Structure formats: structure tokens, C-alpha cells
Amino acid sequence: MLSLESEVLTRHLPLFANKSILLFGDVRDRFADQIKANAKSVAVFSSYFDYARQYADVSFGLYCEIKAELAVFYWTKNKQECQYQLLQWLSQVDVGQEMLIIGENRAGVRSVEKLLEPYGNIAKIDSARRCGLYHFELQSVPDFDGKKFWKSYRLQDLNIFALPAVFSSAELDDGTQLLLSTFNKADRLKGKVLDLGCGAGVIGASLKQQFEKIKLTMSDIHAMALESSRRTLAENALDGTVVASDVFSNIEERFDLIVSNPPFHDGIDTAYRAVEDLIAQAKQRLNRGGELRIVANAFLPYPDLLDKAFGSHQVIAKSNKFKVYSAKA
């Protein structure tokens, strides 16, 4: 099934004929298969591991270094993430480079005109399926300084670092704050700890600083989050392993504690698939007596999921908006 963006691209198949093609950005389907027959070659790059892991021909990472005669960028909902990815890629190609940018209007794709105008000619060439399609030709190669995109803030004795589109990138969010408040020195936490959906590394770094003896693993699907967590650990001289994983897809160990402020937004829609998988599979990933501890908006239907997977659960903290749930193996 094609995304709305790819449906618009199918109206312009002659543009892909006999050219090397790169698809990158928020690619979420197999439009590549639609153009392979007529294109010279097709490469796909994604910064999202949940998509990339499904297909052997999709490259995953933070920096896209793949060159192509025609690049197609799928706009994401985060303008700064788009700016980062577009300028990073354009900084390494030559004047005359062609690019198509496709995105949903509600995701703010119109702002690509202002973003890319300083670097070349951009024009809207189609509008359909509530999407806009733009053609861009590079005339002035941009300078890309990745350092300018970093944000940082102080959290007690920690320095937190984050790239665009990473959750809790500018300040500590209320849910994570409530979750962290449930840990104290008296817990004497030890053993293997997994911070799943680590974002900027706030939870994992806080626990590692408080409980030095834990063996910390942090995971996320987003390359920008993984890089953010690595830097947060490094800047605070903390040890930990950071891995790309779609829930438990790339994790084989068992843990004494799995802790998470799990995402329930997918792009600009709400989705629960990752959280459902987390709760359903967590018990099998815990050592005997191990604990799953998560924070969530109070309105979300997690109690039933926890009871189904674990048999019971406890609410160990709550506020007007959030609840912290604990379930033990």
C-alpha cells in the first residue's frame, strides 16, 4: 500500500526513467518497487529503524551519503529535521542537482519553498491527495554545520543533548519527570537496565548517574535519538550501550528493569503499535522478578494491556495527566 505522498509521485513516473534515484526522508512504503523497472537504479535511505529493518535494500543511519541523479525527499512533520536532512545531503552534491520534495500539506511541506529558495530554483509542480510536490534545482551548495542543530539543557547534575525531532529535546517533559521521581537511592537498583525509546537519553543517563553499578542499554528507532543519547552519555562521562531497535527487534538480552516513556505519536497521527508490542513482549525480556516501569498519559488504555501480559500491575505515581505503571515478571 502506497502512502499519499507516493500516490502523487505515481502521477510523474516519466521523471524517474533512466535515472539513478534516491528516496530519503520519511519514506514509509515501497514506492521504490514502482520505479525500479524504468529507473537506472533506486536507493532508499531512512533514519527510522522500524522501517529500514523490514527491507534489505534500505540503508539506515543519520547521514545520507548516497548520490543520485534525482533525489526524492519525503517531508517529515518536524521542520528542523527536514532542514537538517536536506542541507546535510545538498552540502555534498554538485550545482545542477535535481530533487523532488513531497509532503502532506498538514505536515507543513509548504515551508520547503522558503527553506530552499536561497540555494536554487524551487517550484510546485503538483497538488493532490492533500499533498504538495516540489521540484528543486541546486544553484548554490549550502554549508552544513551539524553543530548548529544541537540543543542542550541542564537536568540537575546532567547535561542533556538532543538533535531535532528527538522527544524532550528542549526541556524535561512532565511525564519523564514523574517517572524519574519514582526512583531513589534507597532502591539500590542494580543489574541490567533497558531504557527503551531513549530519545535524548534522559532516563538512562539519570539512572546511570544515580545507580553507577547498573549495566545500561538504551534503544530507539530514530537515528537522531540514538546520536543524541550517545552524546548525552559521553558528555556526562557515563557508560552505556546504545542500539537501534524497533521495540525488542534488535535486543536479545534479558533485563532486571525495562523503563520507558513510550511514544504514542507516529508522525502526525496517534499510534499504539510500539507500546502494545513493548507491554506484550516485556515479560519474556525480563529476568525472574524483573520489572517493567513505564509512564503514560492517564487516558491511554495500558492497564488492560499490562494485566493481560503480566496478570497484574500497580500505579506507583500519578499526576493530573500521567500515571507511572509497574508490572513484575
UniProtKB/Swiss-Prot annotation:
Location in the cell: Cytoplasm
GO MF annotations, alphabetized: 16S rRNA (guanine(1207)-N(2))-methyltransferase activity; nucleic acid binding
Classification via InterPro entries: DNA_methylase_N6_adenine_CS, Mtase_sm_N, rRNA_ssu_MeTfrase_C, RsmC/RlmG, SAM-dependent_MTases_sf, Small_mtfrase_dom
Keyword Iron: no
Enzyme Commission (EC) number: 2.1.1.172
Any one GO CC term of the record: cytoplasm
Keywords, comma-separated and alphabetical: Cytoplasm, Methyltransferase, rRNA processing, S-adenosyl-L-methionine, Transferase
Reactions accelerated catalytically: guanosine(1207) in 16S rRNA + S-adenosyl-L-methionine = N(2)-methylguanosine(1207) in 16S rRNA + S-adenosyl-L-homocysteine + H(+)
Function according to Swiss-Prot or TrEMBL: Specifically methylates the guanine in position 1207 of 16S rRNA in the 30S particle.
UniProt subunit comment: Monomer.
Protein family membership: Belongs to the methyltransferase superfamily. RsmC family.
Entry-linked PANTHER family: RIBOSOMAL RNA SMALL SUBUNIT METHYLTRANSFERASE C
Protein name: Ribosomal RNA small subunit methyltransferase C
Organism annotation: Actinobacillus pleuropneumoniae serotype 7 (strain AP76)
Gene name per UniProt: rsmC
